[in-house]
């Protein structure tokens, strides 16, 4: 296989992030300088984002049998890069108060971003597995980065052991699919999965095991048990990456797999996915009701959001509107999560010790940091799906797709789940405006809005509001980002 200049242009984001990994690694070996390595990482991620314009000019193509670069890949690559950029930005002040080695943090984020980009472009079960491992392995180190805190170390061990088990399920499932079909390419699987082949026991067992592995990575019920503990134990910037880049990249590749290989045509698989979606929506929201730790609350909330997205995935065979719904919902979820976790990161930095994740830490925040409290309120309203926010547009799309596909009991679950979610999101928002305690335990720096993390949080809030009122530009971008068929 010959690589042409056109192919290299299509792979620019992957190549730039890979080059940044090498440069940061050499920089660490030469001389440890926190500011230099953070700057190099941010420049590399920004350059990869800018390179997407050149990728768009090159057009859609199969670069290798494992990778397909098209509008769909560009959208999800962009979202992964934005989440990685925000993670590095939030991490800088947090690492300023960190006594151990700081520079490796950026290296791990960049390697995980490489995995996310590979997943966004994956067109083969081999690249799907490589991408998932490339995004998971750095996260083992990132989750336990504050290893002197017992909770962070415990979260890292839990995540490592359970993730390894999930990967083995995924790999075994792929082996069974290959044994029955004789191919691992998404497109080839799509051609071979007709004529009742989807009812073959070996194939059903293979896809069932793959659902277990992918369900763990996406923290869907009943494979979700690691989520609240890991979100709570991980440093706030790492929780940001876990909730955004990791979920978006993996859900994107699952969408492509279901689109090319019509796995959803099997009634058995559709029923299993519908039960998982229903359980994730209801259980995720119910468990979040009693949480007083904001990171655990957002962890349970992410379970329910993936349940909502699963409704659109089940309805994928009904038309392009499902693709549109997932794209709009994920963009809304990305910016809302970046804003919410960004506020937690700002409140936690550059303090030593555990993050400011107790709900009590945010009590009365409005009276001394009014803009930060307003940002957090907007994020909570968007995650709850209140009109005039981007979260509402995404949820409306999911409901419309569910109705179009006649998934009535899942539509009912979305409505009930949203009603339950409204309670705990508003509980966080209301606590911001209560009387502040005489001695607040944590507070954001007085100049937070001039820091890089503060600017990211403010831009996220602005986009959530502007695109919530005028979503047409986003809808146009998502419509352009359709996979090459």
From Swiss-Prot:
- Give the InterPro entries listed for this entry: NADH-Q_OxRdtase_suN/2, ND/Mrp_TM
Which EC class is this protein assigned?
translocase
* GO biological process terms on file: ATP synthesis coupled electron transport
**Membrane-traversing stretches:** 8-28, 35-55, 71-91, 105-125, 127-147, 159-179, 203-223, 235-255, 271-291, 297-317, 326-346, 373-393, 408-430, 455-475
Catalysed reactions, as listed in the record: a quinone + NADH + 5 H(+)(in) = a quinol + NAD(+) + 4 H(+)(out)
User: In the UniProt record, which is one GO cellular component term?
Assistant: plasma membrane
Indicate how the chain sits in the lipid bilayer.
Multi-pass membrane protein
Q: Which Pfam families match?
A: Proton_antipo_M (PF00361)
In which domain of life is the source organism classified? Bacteria
Where is the protein situated, by its record's location annotation? Cell inner membrane
What Gene Ontology molecular function terms does this protein carry?
NADH dehydrogenase (ubiquinone) activity; NADH:ubiquinone reductase (non-electrogenic) activity; quinone binding
Q: Keywords in UniProt for this one?
A: Cell inner membrane, Cell membrane, Membrane, NAD, Quinone, Translocase, Transmembrane, Transmembrane helix, Transport, Ubiquinone
Q: What is its EC number?
A: 7.1.1.-
Signal peptide region: none
Q: Family, per the entry? A: Belongs to the complex I subunit 2 family.
What function is annotated for this protein?
NDH-1 shuttles electrons from NADH, via FMN and iron-sulfur (Fe-S) centers, to quinones in the respiratory chain. The immediate electron acceptor for the enzyme in this species is believed to be ubiquinone. Couples the redox reaction to proton translocation (for every two electrons transferred, four hydrogen ions are translocated across the cytoplasmic membrane), and thus conserves the redox energy in a proton gradient.
* Oligomeric form and interacting partners: NDH-1 is composed of 13 different subunits. Subunits NuoA, H, J, K, L, M, N constitute the membrane sector of the complex.
Tell me the protein's name: NADH-quinone oxidoreductase subunit N
Tell me the organism.
Answer: Escherichia coli O81 (strain ED1a)
Question: What lineage is on file?
Answer: Bacteria, Pseudomonadati, Pseudomonadota, Gammaproteobacteria, Enterobacterales
The gene from which this protein is expressed is: nuoN
